Amino acid sequence: MKKFIIAVCCIVVCVLLFDYLYYYQGVYIDFSPNKKPITFVCTKGEKIYLDEGNGFEEFEIKGVDIGSGMPGEWSTDFGITKSDYLRWFKQIKEMGANTVRIYTINNDVFYNAFYEFNKDNPDPLYLLHGVWVNDYLYNSARDAYDPELIDTFINDCKIMIDIVHGNRKLQLGRDASSGHGTYNKDISQWVIGYILGVEWEDVTVVYTNEKFKNNEKYNAYKGKYMYSTQDATPFEAMLARVGDEAIEYETKRYKTQKLVAFSNWPITDPFTYPQYITDYFDKCASVDVEHIGCTDKVLSGHFASYHIYPYYRDYLAFVKDFNELSFDVDIESCYKDGTLNTYKLYLKAIADHHAIPVVISEFGVPTGRGIAHIDTNTGRNQGHMPETEQGPALVACYNDIIEAGCAGSCLFSWQDEWFKRTWNTNYAIDFMRTPYWSDVQTNEQYFGLLSFDPGKEKTVCYIDGDVSEWSEDDIVMKSDDLTLSMKYDEAYVYFLAKKDNFDFNNEKLYIPIDTTPKSGSSYCENNDLRFDRAVDFLITINGRKNSKIQVQERYEVLRANYAKEVYGFDTYVKGNIPMRDSPKFVDINIILQMSQLVDGNHLTEAEVFPTGVLTYGNGNPDAKNYNSLSDFICNGDYVEIRIPWQLLNFSDPSRLQIHDDYYDGHYGIEPINIDSIYVGVSNEVTDQRIHLEQVEMKGWENKVTYHERLKPAYYVMQSIWREKDES
């Protein structure tokens, strides 16, 4: 009996040891060292070819980038369910896409769903799989050859390869940017390639190159499958090593090869520019995959991957003389109706530069109310774009990509992502709470073809003039001829103002709002209005074109953070601090550029956008005249209004958290919590004070509600891609 117990224990230990070494550590024995590798995907010249059973045929990647975030979840929570993925894969395929791209190792849920969708599907989806570089390692004081960075990078490539072949287990918490689970589904037959790395930080590239520029060991790499040329920088040689080890690992262990690419973007593009552009954009680094080659042992090939948007960074929009550029461009072919399409021009320059296929692995335009960059040539801006214009803008981008000679593209992105933040609004919010509300002022959250609208089945209010969704319970104040109602959800505060016999074209409506007890004014000198308590914001409804929301001078968040850039002075210097009860109400703007480049001259004056201007229109997605940017609409005696939380200086509405007084010992943004606001309504200027009523409010913490909705752009892209497939 004793021997039996010992034997059983030994067997258990051996099984556990095998499980640990094989599935957790990737240890294996090659029992077929002489078996030749195969591939079903390869490159030839500037094209990609795929063998789907009838031999190699030219293949255009028509892809969609899928993030890992959901409302109420961080991307690193990997909260998307199997049923979500299966539904999305079906919709993506029906749109006409043939490929999806993910950026990092997801939870096993993704791979199980991908396998189930494809296993009996005669027309499967293909996958481009990314390998993320650890944010902490990459943004710390390390060069690219630091063992913690490059060794982790290479190891993650091998783990990812094991995962797509169904031979890996990962523990929860192994890496903040990585999923976990048991990966036992072999999806490799649908994986066409790997995009390794991230949008490289220029300072890391420069630091690496400068540190090792005189060290021959780091200036060249020659591997069995990949090598760097004599023109390669140390950083490019590092990439060659990573790619070589990834290809070697898959070739030896799984006897197959996929395409390999390295992530890139305009900040590290391979070009040099005139000095005034270099100085303005701080263009200091280049990564050129033409300096990385494949040996004859590579059956698949490699391609150049770029994230390129029409507005960032639009170097060519500022070129005074195109003869100054380091590359040849066909300018005449990029004019349309007398306007130079610099996006197409840049794409052509990229495609012409490379002798290998070019895939634009990210392109897109967001539909958020906020805005971060303006495309001065084609109007494909980063934000403040109606959903109905997103589709045509995406089609224009896609056509530019194909006409430039690229081998494929991936549309960014499939779904909106509430957790995202962007540089020109993140100072105003609690960025540890972004997944728990829909911040329409942050454009980065709204690139998706799939929208997550607040409300379990429908939104609490649509700005469409239909007042049937309002009830007596929503009324917060009432007088002889005026009534004001209010409600809110994860994205907006909604108002319904009713004025008997209201003449929209000739009358005004004023809605004062008091949020903070720390400041505000009982008088607005702009409109000669008086209030019975200190007011922080004033909504003025003045026809279709002149309606706006303004903020009391002391509570202007743009001034508190960008006074020097926008106004040319330090607002925290004594004499510049606005009075606590200043009667001046100012327009609400959002910063776009910290400085400007005009005719080659670098101007220190910042560029701003009037985000407090209210847009008239129908905000119901089911309406024929739908405008997703609409802020208000009038129907007879009724005016419906919706105001984004951020315009009211809420840093986290899920917890009713607003900005504290910027000048009362804080010198910037600090949060305070409230449990109510005060609102009022008036339609005339009189000596009487406008009365404000208290409205009790309650946050929702982490319990968000939402429902999915395909944006119009989905159907626009569907018509383009499906028509192309049928032709």
Predicted feature residues:
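Short, well-ordered beta-strand segments enriched in hydrophobic/aromatic residues
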Residues: G465, Y492-D500, D637-W645
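Glycoside hydrolase catalytic-domain groove-lining segments
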Residues: D282-N377
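Active-site groove signature of glycoside hydrolases
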Residues: D143-A144, I159-T233, Y254-P266
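Surface-exposed, glycine/proline- and aromatic-rich loop segments on solvent-exposed faces
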Residues: V476-L597, H659-E684
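Aromatic-rich peripheral "rim/lid" segments of glycoside hydrolase catalytic domains that contact
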Residues: I371-G379, E389, D400-V476, E708-S727
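A solvent-exposed, charged loop/short amphipathic helix patch at secondary-structure junctions
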Residues: E148, T152-K158, V205-A237, F318-K336, ...
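Active-site-adjacent substrate/metal-binding segments within catalytic domains
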Residues: G26-K119
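Aromatic-lined substrate-binding rim segments of carbohydrate-active enzymes
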Residues: T81-I161, V242-K258, F327, K336
